[in-house]
């Protein structure tokens, strides 16, 4: 079988020429085997009609297999020549012929320098895309951080509103007075706690 991939021919036919030849070879080989089996059966029937025949079916089978090997060798030799003719003259697209989908290359051909330039430009665009993607990810991460900060700020403002409401409930006119009131009460609670702790220690000692 040919080792040439013949990719352009495969693009046109939809299959590789080598695959086509292989299928033809298998079909011929199967037909040869079937013919030899049929011939063997005919010979065996003829021998059954001959009285006291010294030729056994085993000998017939050996002769059939030997003849089959001979025919297969001749067939392989002939098929190899036929395959070369098919692949060179019938299933091959001439080098000066373009497929319809490639006709644009006749008027828009590229030199090797232009190809390398386009390849370099593609690489630059890929790098630019990667950079923009990283920038986008960084902006999204920053946006998430801003959302967290905004949520904490909202929570802090809500706490200040609660403190202001507590101050108003106790007679403070604004947030500053309410904060002073809370600080004073906090100090009072701290003093009470210290006194309780001292009293508890004194009772333990006594």
From Swiss-Prot:
It is found in: Chromosome, Centromere, Kinetochore. Signal peptide: none annotated. GO terms for cellular component: MIS12/MIND type complex; nucleus. Belongs to the mis12 family. Its main location: nucleus. It comes from Bos taurus. This is Protein MIS12 homolog. It comes from the Eukaryota. Residues 108-205 form a coiled coil. PANTHER family: PROTEIN MIS12 HOMOLOG. Keywords: Cell cycle, Cell division, Centromere, Chromosome, Coiled coil, Kinetochore, Mitosis. Part of the MIS12 complex, which may be fundamental for kinetochore formation and proper chromosome segregation during mitosis. Essential for proper kinetochore microtubule attachments. The lineage of its organism: Eukaryota, Metazoa, Chordata, Craniata, Vertebrata. GO terms for biological process: attachment of mitotic spindle microtubules to kinetochore; cell division; kinetochore assembly; mitotic sister chromatid segregation. Component of the MIS12 complex composed of MIS12, DSN1, NSL1 and PMF1. Also interacts with KNL1, CBX3, CBX5, NDC80 and ZWINT.
């Amino acid at each position: 079988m040919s080792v040439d991939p013949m990719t352009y021919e495969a693009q046109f036919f939809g299959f590789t020429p080598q695959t086509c030849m292989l299928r033809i070879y298998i079909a011929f080989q199967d037909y040869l085997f079937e013919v030899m089996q049929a011939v063997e059966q005919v010979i065996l029937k003829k021998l059954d009609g001959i009285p006291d025949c010294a030729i056994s079916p085993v000998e017939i089978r050996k002769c059939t297999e030997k003849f089959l090997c001979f025919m297969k060798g001749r067939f392989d030799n002939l098929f190899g020549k036929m395959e070369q003719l098919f692949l060179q003259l019938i299933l091959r697209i001439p080098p000066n012929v373009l497929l319809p989908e490639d006709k644009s290359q006749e008027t828009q051909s590229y030199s090797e320098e232009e190809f390398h330039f386009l390849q370099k430009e593609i690489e630059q665009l890929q790098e630019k895309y990667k950079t923009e993607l990283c920038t986008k990810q960084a902006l999204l991460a920053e946006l998430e951080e801003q959302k967290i900060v905004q949520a904490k700020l909202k929570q802090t403002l809500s706490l200040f509103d609660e403190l202001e409401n507590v101050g108003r409930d106790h007679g403070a006119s604004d947030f500053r007075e309410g904060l002073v009131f809370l600080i004073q009460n906090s100090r009072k609670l701290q003093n009470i706690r210290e006194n309780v702790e001292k009293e508890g220690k004194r009772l333990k000692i006594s």
